[in-house]
Amino acid sequence: MKGIIFTSLLFLLPFMVLKAQDENKVFEKVEQNANTNQKTWNEHISRKTQLPDSVIKEIPAGTYKVNIQFVVDIHGNVGQIKAKNDPGYGLAKMAVDVISTYKGKWQPANQCGRNVKAYKEQPIIFIVPAQ
C-alpha cells in the first residue's frame, strides 16, 4: 500500500510543480491581451495627466513621455508597476500613480484557454504648455 502511495506521489509531483511554475510565470506574448473598458481607461489617463499649476511652474515647457510597464494577473488585478524611463521632474512617479489609481476592472490575458499573468505597457504623456 505504501508503495502505491509513494509511486502515485512520484507521478503527480512533477505535474504539481509545473502547474505552480505556470501560475507564477508572467507572459510577454499571449493569444489574447489583457484589456479593460477603453473609454474609461482613456478618460482616466486624460484626467490624471493634467498637471496642477504648481507643478507646471517648475517644469520647462514641452511634451514628456513616460513608458509604464505593469502586470495584469489572472484575476484582473494590476501590479508590478514601473516606469521604464524617467524624464525627470517627478513625472515617472506621477505616471506610475496614473496606472495605480485606475479603478476600472481588467480582463486578464488568455493563453490556451486559461487566464494568465501578462505584461502590459502604456505610454503616459504629460504636456507642459509654454507660459
Regions found by a protein language model. Name each.
Residues F11-L12:
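Repetitive helical segments and hydrophobic/amphipathic motifs
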